[in-house]
């Protein structure tokens, strides 16, 4: 059955492939972008900035005006900031939280009245493996994803009476534009520079050696079609799934040593 789906952040990576694959399956797909770019021909493009509440409301209202309802909201859009906590400019980590978390809250708030009126629906929130464990030199990215985890847990319970399901997606390392688009900050000659360069090189290698975004997009298409999707889908390599399990069962000090070793921290 065809559904009306709103996907945020379709200019590249996950969002672009998700919108493309969903439209190929016959769904009415609306996708948001900040700047002009090429997208699949059957996707309705909406200009939206996650840091601009008015643009968020306008995007949702456009879908409602043209389709009458929203069946599925996929919150994929965001940004990625890398660098040590001490040296992060306040405007950048504020921008990180505004884009990844506050913007997600605003679009959920805008869509929910319409989803309730429609008798239900599905909200798919993109977290990350970094939303299940703090990652060195990605502290604000991890923080924004941890916030999405907590929000989704609470939201799931609040929306149960309205037949609105909340699904969290935890991608592992994927080969997307996230690596080149990440904003990396460190003070030249500062106390973190050497370690940051070493760790961020490892992070970049993990990402460029990761899976292609088509794998995740196909999984999202299957989730959209499910009547009762699971609360969480960890879409990652065996090693990354194992890390999630190990964090739950190991003492935090021992688990931290494993991460420190992986990221070359001594």
Residue ranges and their predicted role:
Residues 11, 19:
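N-terminal Rossmann NAD(P)H-binding glycine-rich loop of SDR-like oxidoreductase domains
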Residues 48-58, 90:
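The beta1-alpha1 cofactor-binding region of Rossmann-like NAD(H)/NADP(H)-dependent oxidoreductases
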Residues 84-85, 89-94:
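Substrate-binding pocket helix/loop in short-chain dehydrogenase/reductase
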Residues 108, 144-147:
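Active-site helix of classical SDR
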Residues 108-109, 153:
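A short, exposed helix-loop element centered on a Lys and neighboring polar residues
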Residues 128:
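Residue(s) in the substrate-gating loop at a strand-loop-helix junction
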Residues 160-207:
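C-terminal beta-strand-loop-alpha-helix "lid" module of Rossmann-like NAD(P)-dependent dehydrogenases
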């Amino acid at each position: 059955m065809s559904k009306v789906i709103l996907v945020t952040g379709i200019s590249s990576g996950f969002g672009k492939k998700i919108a493309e694959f969903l439209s190929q399956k016959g769904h009415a797909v609306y996708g948001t972008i900040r700047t002009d770019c090429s997208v699949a021909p059957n996707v309705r493009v909406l200009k939206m900035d996650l840091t601009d509440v008015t643009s968020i409301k306008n995007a949702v209202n456009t879908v409602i005006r043209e389709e009458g309802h929203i069946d599925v909201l996929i919150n994929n859009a965001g940004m990625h900031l890398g660098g040590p906590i001490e040296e992060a400019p306040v405007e950048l980590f504020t921008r990180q939280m505004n884009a990844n978390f506050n913007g997600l809250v605003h679009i959920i708030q805008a869509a929910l009245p319409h989803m309730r009126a429609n008798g239900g629906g599905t909200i798919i929130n993109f977290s990350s493996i970094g939303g299940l464990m703090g990652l060195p030199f990605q502290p604000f990215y991890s923080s924004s994803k941890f916030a999405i985890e907590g929000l989704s847990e609470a939201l799931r319970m609040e929306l149960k009476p309205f037949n609105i399901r909340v699904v969290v997606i935890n991608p592992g390392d994927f080969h997307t534009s996230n690596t080149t688009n990440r904003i990396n900050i460190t003070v030249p000659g500062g106390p973190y520079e050497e370690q940051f360069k070493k760790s961020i090189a490892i992070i970049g290698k993990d990402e460029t050696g990761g899976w292609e975004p088509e794998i995740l997009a196909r999984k999202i298409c299957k989730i959209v079609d499910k009547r009762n999707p699971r609360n969480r889908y960890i879409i990652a390599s065996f090693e990354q799934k194992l890390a999630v399990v190990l964090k739950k069962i190991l003492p935090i000090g021992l688990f931290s040593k494993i991460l420190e070793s992986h990221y070359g921290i001594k």
